[in-house]
Amino acid sequence: MAASQGGGGNSGGGGCGGGGSSGGCGTAGGGGGGAGGGGGGGGGTLVVPIPVPTLFGQPFPNGPPWNPGSLQPQHTVRSLDRALEEAGSSGILSLSGRKLRDFPGSGYDLTDTTQADLSRNRFTEIPSDVWLFAPLETLNLYHNCIKTIPEAIKNLQMLTYLNISRNLLSTLPKYLFDLPLKVLVVSNNKLVSIPEEIGKLKDLMELDISCNEIQVLPQQMGKLHSLRELNIRRNNLHVLPDELGDLPLVKLDFSCNKVTEIPVCYRKLHHLQVIILDNNPLQVPPAQICLKGKVHIFKYLNIQACCRMDKKPDSLDLPSLSKRMPSQPLTDSMEDFYPNKNHGPDSGIGSDNGEKRLSTTEPSDDDTVSLHSQVSESNREQTSRNDSHIIGSKTDSQKDQEVYDFVDPNTEDVAVPEQGNAHIGSFVSFFKGKEKCSEKSRKNEELGDEKRLEKEQLLAEEEDDDLKEVTDLRKIAAQLLQQEQKNRILNHSTSVMRNKPKQTVECEKSVSADEVNSPLSPLTWQPLENQKDQIDEQPWPESHPIIWQSEERRRSKQIRKEYFKYKSMRKSSSGNENDEQDSDNANMSTQSPVSSEEYDRTDGFSHSPFGLKPRSAFSRSSRQEYGAADPGFTMRRKMEHLREEREQIRQLRNNLESRLKVILPDDIGAALMDGVVLCHLANHIRPRSVASIHVPSPAVPKLSMAKCRRNVENFLDACKKLGVSQERLCLPHHILEERGLVKVGVTVQALLELPTTKASQLSVA
């Protein structure tokens, strides 16, 4: 149909003579012949000529629509040529967002290019023409398909800015870190590690390695003494390296990682203005501290550091305040850590307003440059002692053409030469004073360590002396007993020996109350450290001397072992000592141990630890006194008592672990103090016996004492309801103060021994 209409148009053109122009127009117009044919078909033999502009402005419905984008490639080519021409004259090459796969600048001289923007293209590798740009300082390769960085990049020895983010890099080559880079952006790649050679980038000020798969940061990052901004967001980091605490960071972003702890040494980041740590399972500091902001985080880190170094809370390490205000004394306020006003040369780094934080302007005066270099030099010396906070970024400011300037750019340049020398002198004197203070504190710490070691040695010597004294006294008593045995054999007949049991019974009845209650009596109860005046229950007069000596050596070794075991168990068992005593010894004296001076009043034997006297020790009455000593307070009986307590505590641990299927720590008293384990045990015996249990959370890992007491009281109430008798029920302080584990074990044992039928009846009721 269209072809026939076109034919009509052509024939009409031949008949009228005007069709020639119409047909000519159609031929020249590229599709106009079809339009003319349509016109001829509609108008018969008459064809109306249509001007060319009208054809483009008002396309006919039956013809193909005109697409203005058909001319776009010609404009793109012209704009690309124009960009290359401008790059040759200005040194700035901008080819961003052109979907280029190959570099088009083969016919242009671009060797003087200083800035090249090749971002948002489709380069699979860095164009080889770029390696010819010797003076290149800035290279932007953002959003391409680059997989590797060739070694030819070493030709760009003036490159300070490199952005190769959002590409397909899996590793960073070692030769990349031989360049004088100040800004390196390699985010949104597939990096799994950072080479150790990154420590060579002494001038690096900004590093962005976010959105990768990095698991560990190298320790060599602590050598980046000029680093101001570090972005390690969205990686797989579990631990932050301690070396970052020595850097002069202004911004730190480690969000969206797996970090659980901020190192305490990060309290030295006194220039830090922005810290982003969200989306991390942080435990130290706790979540409620992190939500309060930067100041509270640093305060928490300072308190933790003081606790670890056994310092007082009023000796917090606040050197940043003294650096910002050398003429003002230090205070304990953590709010001064980051003042809102500018002080001294720290105009941008020490403020929170975010303005003028990173100034890239070069000092306009030689005195300003010298001041900056002097401050940086002093800071480098302090950094080597791990006690400084870096203010400058480099030692030589003239070498760095784009350093971060810490002098307020709004300050008049005229005032700098007048005050430059004063600033230099004040800072140098301040740092010298700081060195002296650090030396004094170091000496004080050394003296404290020496004193602590001396005290420990004295305590160890005292313990050894006590043990030696016990063994010496036993030897003396052994000699006296041997002498007594010889005298008895010589002076007494066989009939006297037959009546010995009867005399022993009479002597036991004749012990006076004065002897029992006397402060020097051998029956006086005393702690184990002074068990020198206690008697062993072994029948000494009946033993053979040689057998007794071998037995004595064995006992002395056993005493030494039990002595140190007792000291470790004394804290947990001290609350139960009075409860375990026999009723016959309830009224005995509990006075302080007898001093060594009292032993020497009568040649060391008048009140000997075995109740023996120098000459009357061989008489019958002294033997009766010796035989009447209560064996319940001997050292061996005390050791047996401690072994029983340890066995009960072990049984308590086994009961809890077997019933609850958990593993308790070595310090079982601390594990039971909050009452959570005991409440779970009660609910295990009878469900819902404890309605509510206060449990710790990751944000608050330790319960308050009020909540601990509430848990303990709920547990004891549940025990009463379940049928535990009052005699076998422990008291709250036995659990809360960790001093009655034996009583707690009795209560738990009673709870487990309840009949199942009774427990089921109670649950039904």
Curated annotation (Swiss-Prot):
Pfam families: CH (PF00307), LRR_8 (PF13855). Residues 438-472 form a coiled coil. InterPro entries: CH_dom (IPR001715), CH_dom_sf (IPR036872), Leu-rich_rpt (IPR001611), Leu-rich_rpt_typical-subtyp (IPR003591), LRR_dom_sf (IPR032675), LRR_domain-containing (IPR050216). LRR repeats lie at residues 89-110, 112-133, 135-156, 158-179, 180-201, 203-224, 226-248, 249-269, 271-292. It comes from the Eukaryota. May play a role in the organization of the cytoskeleton. This is Leucine-rich repeat and calponin homology domain-containing protein 2. The gene is LRCH2.
